[in-house]
């Protein structure tokens, strides 16, 4: 629609300061926009189950390295980002639940910093960029909180994540709740909204391009460091300057080290590379692993056979993803497939699948969980881990499978989880397992033949949809992966 404005009115508008306020039920400044922060704040309040109170969050401060004047790389606290969308240091945030008012506090203007580092974030710029109701400078934070406390704190608490993050000002008797906000935010973050899914998809898109580029160029490389370098270069070239986690580029026996990050050994004489690397986009992670040969085809039957076992583990688990599924059952399925495959190879001795699984023998070769949530953290938060075991009991022990809780949350629409089975032949793990009861199920002479391949892991990020799943990961694998390597060699 076009509106005609008389010329005399146009000339008079130049001296006017016009501001338009749009009011209406359910209208947000940026519906589903940058960070979808206001939507997230309301969701957290709903998970808290309260209609009043003040959520108070402290962003990541600027911190120098020890004994240095150089700042550490900045990484915003993820709970803060979830409610602000602000990837800037030294910020604070409040959300007045009763008045539905989300306020971001940015650092006061610092002339010295502006001269040395460039323009600093202003309130006007922040209001344009972030999905918050109001932006104020830090100088206003103390008086604003004191005003809220004077009006409401007798009846409603100030919610904080940790006791160390209380508002720092001269009020002696604050009504503080440092117990309920963290689980409420975990519950809110576990199911992703459309904005978050767009970010995770884009992170996966860039990761897919980087994995593909490595496959195309792998025949030219002579060291693990070159793999890491090319992956990083591709991500940065596509706008993703940060990785969701340290790149793992383990060749040969190094592939059996789950979190191998040295990435500095020569590739000569090695059979496989396990590349676990994922870009980050707007603070949202991708988590992708591919294992591929350093040749146009599988260099040995051992490498091919182990890859096919892991490939089947992943395919069978992914096809069962849907709402209502218990992730623990998929973990058990993956172990059962691994056991049958390793028995065919002669690595595991005869016995029922169940008795071998319960003994923990398969966990010698598959010692980690099948997957985890993905979001603002690569190992994203939830009220209760989908495997039934929390961070203090990471799944690295042989008794992981029998110890897993039967009472675990079911998969829900909107969750994003990894499916990352693996089979590894760790010289250290095999030597240690000789002393364990489950050693009776392992043919060590046969298992040690596989040590040169290291291990195989394949990992994709899977969205739980209303009727099933969507694979968000675009990195090539299987036959497509091999074809890309061959084309690279031919060219």
Curated annotation (Swiss-Prot):
Q: Reaction(s) catalyzed by this protein?
A: Release of any N-terminal amino acid, including proline, that is linked to proline, even from a dipeptide or tripeptide
Enzyme Commission code(s) on record: 3.4.11.9
- What does the cofactor section's free text say about binding? Binds 2 manganese ions per subunit.
* UniProt entry keywords in alphabetical sequence: Aminopeptidase, Hydrolase, Manganese, Metal-binding, Metalloprotease, Protease
The record's annotation in Gene3D superfamilies points to:
Creatinase/methionine aminopeptidase superfamily (3.90.230.10), Creatinase/prolidase N-terminal domain (3.40.350.10)
Q: Which terms does the record give in the GO molecular function aspect?
A: manganese ion binding; metalloaminopeptidase activity
Q: Which cofactor does it need?
A: Mn(2+)
Entry function: Catalyzes the removal of a penultimate prolyl residue from the N-termini of peptides.
Q: Which CDD domains match?
A: Prolidase
Tell me the residue numbers annotated for binding Mn(2+) 1.
Answer: 287, 420, 459
What family is it from?
Belongs to the peptidase M24B family.
Which InterPro entries does the entry link to? Aminopep_P_N, Creatin/AminoP/Spt16_N, Creatinase/aminopeptidase-like, Pept_M24, Peptidase_M24B_aminopep-P_CS, X-Pro_dipept-like
Protein name, please?
Probable Xaa-Pro aminopeptidase An01g13040
Residues reported to bind Mn(2+) 2? 276, 287, 459
Instruction: Please name the taxonomic classification of the source.
Output: Eukaryota, Fungi, Dikarya, Ascomycota, Pezizomycotina
Q: Name one GO biological process term.
A: proteolysis
